[in-house]
Amino acid sequence: MLYIGNHTSSSKGYAAMGRQIVKNGGNTFAFFTRNPRGGNAKAIDPADVAKFQEIAREHEFGKIVAHAPYTLNACAAKENLRDFARNTFLDDLKRMEATPGNYYNFHPGSHVGQGIEVGIQKIAEVLNAVLTEEQTTTVLLETMAGKGSEVGSHFQELRAIMDLVEKRDKLGICLDTCHVWDLSLIHISEPTR
């Protein structure tokens, strides 16, 4: 089965997202777990989640994709920023268990002059601190466009992170085609005549 959807606003809750996606002709969606620029997440309403799960069953939804806030930087040079990343991860992964078995996508981070190897190590450290055996959510490392000191713009960097993660079965990759296009990893030529 083909699963298709779009990024949608979570401001009105899970059931509203599900209804909007059905209206759009989709059967999955992505959403931010909280304001994409950071901040606290809204409380999850169990009745809202139950309504969403009915919609998802009725319309044969695929897995949904929660997106971490853009401000999450797992390899920041400043410890307080890495603490924010770890705490946000922990909170979001706990909240994701309200809708078990889905995806949590995040931008790996920017090493900000520390070097790619240090960035990779710090990202793996955060992942090792937050991933648990009990969680049902798969965490996705998103491919990046290579702007500034972003980590994850090359597949080798993502692989290096994954190689350092202990609970590898809780981890995957989100191939952001816009990002890899921007980095020129995708080459499309005109068909020959």
Each language-model region and where it sits:
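N-terminal pre-domain/capping segments
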Residues: 1-66, 72, 76-94
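Active-site beta-loop-alpha junctions enriched in small/polar residues
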Residues: 7-11, 34-36, 68-71, 109-111, ...
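Conserved functional loop/turn residues at catalytic and ligand-binding sites
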Residues: 25, 100, 192
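Short hydrophobic beta-strand that contains or immediately precedes a catalytic carboxylate
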Residues: 65, 173-175
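Active-site acidic/histidine proton-transfer and metal-coordination neighborhood
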Residues: 74-172
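Residue-level detector of conserved catalytic or cofactor/ligand-binding positions
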Residues: 184-192
